[in-house]
From Swiss-Prot:
It is found in: Mitochondrion inner membrane. The gene is COII. GO terms for biological process: ATP synthesis coupled electron transport. It is a multi-pass membrane protein. GO terms for cellular component: mitochondrial inner membrane. The lineage of its organism: Eukaryota, Metazoa, Ecdysozoa, Arthropoda, Hexapoda. This is Cytochrome c oxidase subunit 2. Keywords: Copper, Electron transport, Magnesium, Membrane, Metal-binding, Mitochondrion, Mitochondrion inner membrane, Respiratory chain, Translocase, Transmembrane, Transmembrane helix, Transport. It is an enzyme of class 7 (translocase). Component of the cytochrome c oxidase, the last enzyme in the mitochondrial electron transport chain which drives oxidative phosphorylation. The respiratory chain contains 3 multisubunit complexes succinate dehydrogenase (complex II, CII), ubiquinol-cytochrome c oxidoreductase (cytochrome b-c1 complex, complex III, CIII) and cytochrome c oxidase (complex IV, CIV), that cooperate to transfer electrons derived from NADH and succinate to molecular oxygen, creating an electrochemical gradient over the inner membrane that drives transmembrane transport and the ATP synthase. Cu cation A1 binds at residues 161, 196, 200, 207. Binds a dinuclear copper A center per subunit. The chain crosses the membrane at residues 27-51, 63-81.
Length: 227
């Protein structure tokens, strides 16, 4: 999800998103090198007027252009596999958040606390304040402590949705009758925006997600005040 006047990925707010950005840059460098090499060879052959009548095969060059792509794929596959295992690893979460997708809003439950659950609707344009973002702000934000491991359980009640926060590197499908889970670690305070990333009906574009990251002390105060 791009932001205003920005062609790059969003600034990361978690270690996993940093690793995703590093992998993206790593792969992009390899692709640029391949593009330059292939482009140079094609242009050279296009302007080359020499003909060799007797060169029917070249085992060495065939061996080279078979091995080089394999080595290139290894350089892409190894960091990718490492990142996949990191994204699936779940280590002693402090808090479990349950997210339930509906047409067209989200419900949240803090499973570790009693009676902390709420619905989160997009703020309509006619009710927006001057500091709200159009189609992104909600009436009830998710409040989470930074510098702690968070587990999120995602499901849906009607159709398939997808719970996504780009700056945290999180995208989890919400399937009816199924509970998916992932984890993330927010390493700085702030407000982070996301949206449903699976087409789920007429108002698919109007079910944003907002996370407010605060210190653990302020989070405890928020829990006490909410209770």
């Amino acid at each position: 999800m791009a932001t205003w006047s920005n062609f790059n990925l969003q600034n990361s707010a978690s270690p996993l998103m940093e690793q995703i950005i590093f992998f993206h840059d790593h792969t992009l460098v390899i692709l640029i090198m391949i593009t330059i090499l292939v482009g140079y060879l094609m242009i050279s052959l296009f302007f080359n007027s020499y003909i060799n009548r007797f060169l029917l095969e070249g085992q060495m060059i065939e061996l080279i252009w078979t091995i080089l792509p394999a080595i290139t794929l290894i350089f892409i596959a190894l960091p990718s596999l490492r990142l996949l295992y990191l994204l699936d690893e779940l280590n002693n979460p402090l808090i479990t958040l349950k997210s339930i997708g509906h047409q067209w809003y989200w419900s949240y439950e803090y499973s570790d606390f009693k009676n902390i659950q709420f619905d989160s609707y997009m703020i309509p344009i006619n009710e927006m304040k001057n500091d709200n973002f159009r189609l992104l702000d909600v009436d009830n934000r998710i409040v989470l402590p930074m510098n702690n491991q968070i587990r999120i359980l995602v499901t849906a009640t009607d159709v398939i949705h997808s719970w996504t926060i780009p700056s945290l590197g999180v995208k989890v499908d919400a399937n009816p009758g199924r509970l998916n889970q992932t984890n993330f670690f927010i390493n700085r305070p702030g407000i982070f925006y996301g949206q449903c990333s699976e087409i789920c009906g007429a108002n698919h574009s109007f079910m944003p997600i907002v996370i407010e990251s605060i210190s653990i002390k302020n989070f405890i105060n928020w829990i006490n005040n909410y209770s």
